[in-house]
Amino acid sequence: MGLKAMHAGHSTVLIGRRYLEHGFLDVAMRLFVRNAAQVEKRDWSLLVERLMDRHRIVDAVRVCEIGGVPVPCAQLLALGEGSLRRKDFEAAIHLYELGNADRERWARVVDLLSARPDQERRAIALTERYLVGEAPKVELRLAAAN
């Protein structure tokens, strides 16, 4: 990359920071993505934080991937718990998947789903994906220990 192009990239990132400071997240995100190699981790993290504040989950996860910053799992799981309390199963499941929910959380989802006959297939699918897959490993370890 030539010196002129590098300066242009840095200038664009500086302008992206200004847009971010003023709350223009879409413009900041577009400028950061175009010049991803020159954007600092703290800029990506701040953009993710602001996107999460506005509940723009998909954009926040995408920015984490592009910027190489951690996905805000704790926030995603907290939002998932709120969705679960409201019985918004679709949102809760999506947020739990993004936030890498633990076995206990998945068990709660399955418990709530299994209380509703219309959710039978979903409860079975989630059990197979997140609960049953763990059990054989534990049983094998216990068998090996004896």
What kind of feature is each model-predicted range?
Residues 6-13, 21-26, 38-45, 53-58, ...:
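Generic helix N-cap/helix-start motif at coil->alpha-helix transitions
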Residues 18, 30, 46, 50, ...:
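Residue-level signature for tetratricopeptide repeat
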Residues 1-2, 29-33, 59-67, 91-98, ...:
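Alpha-helical repeat scaffolds
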